[in-house]
């Protein structure tokens, strides 16, 4: 028997206790016919089935503290995480999410080296001090330097000799008017002596050197002149521009990445750790599985607390308990709620998301393990409901897929802009394209399919309206969450988790949306269904 399994009686007891929190309006779920009163375990509720009850409040929405735990050891200033989907999160989205106060999770539907390279891109995008800066040699060509700068989106490189000693620096200004790209760096670079800083320099002292000498890059060297780091003026500017940014102890942006349980899963995980990833998500459609539990446990033994490990996805209390027992630092909840997911229709399996969150929290809460609500979130109010149900953070797919930072293809239809968006269980995600292999199949335990025309998809491909920059979308989502905290008298997410729901009827849902009027101007945070 899989560890962490609980009996239906235990599950029913919890549901009965949760009825009170949901308004006490539920009929006896056992009265469903047949001889087994526990055959139907519970009534499943999702976001459209409930509303948060307003409460006495002295909370001004703008002052509410929306920070929350992502994992046992990582706290986000904004409880939003972008989904590990190939039309949602690559390096550009991960950088933007971290700067906004959340975090991005890089998808795994690409070769191992490319995913690790995207981790490096995020980690190098800004830092208090780059401790392992990209460098070049004096005998490199300008073409080689240009390729490195383009790959890492940087404007120049320190030049070091074979011993690692600083020999000079080369920047865009040095190369801008050079036509011959076969020239060596030594012919063009600014040679030593350069303005440098000693190891251990403080941020204030480094900023002073940059200002006084009107330079943009400050190499850090040891007592023997060997390069040990690089400080750039852009990092100080970025810190001022993005005060909520989620960073590690070295001032670098936080980033997560998804791994599976298939053939290359362990190699992928170790390469991501070496690249500097902060969070690994063992990302499958059904985490209450021996392969997933063993992978979570093995990762925790190997890397300890150096990298946080999240397990998912689950929809039951027993599954969440199994992940907690395996050592997961957070549990991701959601079997079939996503807009592009067809698992509940194809397999007939799943649990409505509010109930799934409540069940997972019952197992994770006493253990101090945060819950991540993944999927089914259509409006900012759904984020508030997910957190009120006990989740600590939310993972977003469709809400972010239409942003400029999402990697989906931009499409024009009848003069309107859309972006492609697909589930990771869709045929497009699970089938290879040309010489490109799909790495998504094992998420649905379908990597043993004899041929791609034998795949059984659990997702669809579609498009979502183009929403513009991520920052605008995040502003609206955070604004809705803050409004909910004001209405419920919740100064923190932890207090919001104690808010009470009321169950509503289909008529109540209809009343909740705009009605009896024709919309003439679109609101930035409401999209008719």
UniProtKB/Swiss-Prot annotation:
Pfam families: CBS, IMPDH. NAD(+) binds at residues 283, 334-336. K(+) binds at residues 336, 338, 341, 511-513. Its EC number is 1.1.1.205. The active site is at residues 341, 443. Keywords: CBS domain, GMP biosynthesis, Metal-binding, NAD, Oxidoreductase, Potassium, Purine biosynthesis, Repeat. It catalyses: IMP + NAD(+) + H2O = XMP + NADH + H(+). Signal peptide: none annotated. IMP binds at residues 339, 374-376, 397-398, 421-425, 458. InterPro entries: Aldolase_TIM, CBS_dom, CBS_dom_sf, IMP_DH, IMP_DH/GMP_Rdtase_CS, IMP_DH_GMPRt. Mycophenolic acid (MPA) is a non-competitive inhibitor that prevents formation of the closed enzyme conformation by binding to the same site as the amobile flap. In contrast, mizoribine monophosphate (MZP) is a competitive inhibitor that induces the closed conformation. MPA is a potent inhibitor of mammalian IMPDHs but a poor inhibitor of the bacterial enzymes. MZP is a more potent inhibitor of bacterial IMPDH. GO terms for biological process: GMP biosynthetic process; GTP biosynthetic process. GO terms for molecular function: IMP dehydrogenase activity; metal ion binding; nucleotide binding. Pathway: Purine metabolism; XMP biosynthesis via de novo pathway; XMP from IMP: step 1/1. It comes from the Bacteria. Homotetramer. Belongs to the IMPDH/GMPR family. HAMAP family: IMPDH (MF_01964). This is Inosine-5'-monophosphate dehydrogenase. The gene is guaB.
């Amino acid at each position: 028997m899989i560890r962490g399994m609980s009996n239906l009686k235990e599950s029913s007891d919890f549901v009965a206790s949760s009825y009170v929190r949901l308004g006490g309006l539920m009929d006896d779920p056992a009265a469903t016919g047949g001889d087994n009163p526990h055959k139907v375990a519970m009534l499943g509720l999702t976001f459209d089935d409930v509303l948060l009850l307003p409460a006495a409040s002295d909370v001004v929405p703008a002052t509410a503290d929306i920070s929350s735990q992502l994992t046992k050891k990582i706290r986000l200033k904004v409880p939003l995480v972008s989904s590990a989907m190939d039309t949602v999160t690559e390096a550009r989205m991960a950088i933007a999410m971290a700067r906004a106060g959340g975090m991005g999770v890089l998808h795994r539907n690409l070769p191992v080296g490319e995913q690790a390279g995207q981790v490096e891109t995020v980690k190098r995008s800004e830092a208090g001090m780059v401790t392992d800066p990209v460098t070049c040699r004096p005998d490199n060509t300008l073409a080689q330097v240009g390729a490195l700068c383009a790959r890492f989106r940087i404007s120049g490189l320190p030049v070091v000799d074979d011993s690692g000693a600083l020999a000079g620096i080369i920047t865009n200004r040095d190369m801008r008017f050079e036509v011959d790209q076969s020239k060596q760096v030594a012919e063009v670079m600014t040679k030593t002596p350069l303005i440098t800083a000693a190891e251990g320099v403080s941020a204030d002292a480094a900023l002073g050197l940059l200002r006084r000498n009107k330079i943009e890059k400050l190499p850090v060297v040891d007592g023997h002149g060997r390069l040990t780091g690089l400080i750039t003026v852009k990092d100080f500017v970025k810190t001022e521009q993005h005060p909520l940014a989620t960073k590690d102890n070295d001032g670098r942006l936080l980033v997560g990445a998804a791994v599976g349980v298939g053939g290359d899963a362990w190699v992928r995980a170790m390469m991501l750790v070496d690249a500097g990833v902060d969070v690994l998500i063992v990302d499958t459609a059904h985490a209450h599985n021996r392969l997933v539990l063993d992978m979570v446990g093995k990762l925790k033994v190997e890397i300890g607390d150096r990298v946080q490990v999240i397990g998912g996805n689950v929809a039951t209390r027993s599954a969440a308990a199994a992940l907690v027992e395996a050592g997961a630092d957070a549990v991701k909840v959601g079997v079939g709620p996503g807009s592009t997911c067809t698992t509940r229709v194809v397999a007939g399996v799943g649990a409505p998301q509010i109930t799934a969150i409540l069940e997972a929290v019952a197992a994770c809460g006493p253990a101090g393990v945060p819950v991540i609500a993944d999927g089914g979130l259509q409006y900012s109010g759904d984020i508030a409901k997910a957190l009120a149900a006990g989740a600590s953070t939310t993972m977003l797919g469709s809400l972010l897929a239409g942003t400029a930072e999402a990697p989906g293809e931009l499409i024009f239809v009848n003069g309107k802009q859309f972006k492609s968006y697909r589930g990771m269980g869709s045929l497009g995600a699970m089938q290879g394209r040309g010489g490109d292999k799909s790495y998504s199949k094992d998420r649905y335990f379908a990597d043993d399919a004899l041929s791609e025309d034998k795949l059984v998809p659990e997702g669809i491909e579609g498009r979502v309206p183009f929403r513009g920059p991520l920052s605008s979308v995040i502003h609206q989502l955070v604004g809705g969450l803050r409004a909910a905290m004001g209405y419920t008298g919740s100064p923190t997410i932890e207090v919001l988790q104690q808010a009470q729901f009321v169950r509503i009827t289909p008529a109540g849902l209809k009343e909740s949306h705009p009605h009896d009027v024709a919309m003439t101007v679109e609101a930035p945070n409401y999209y008719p269904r």
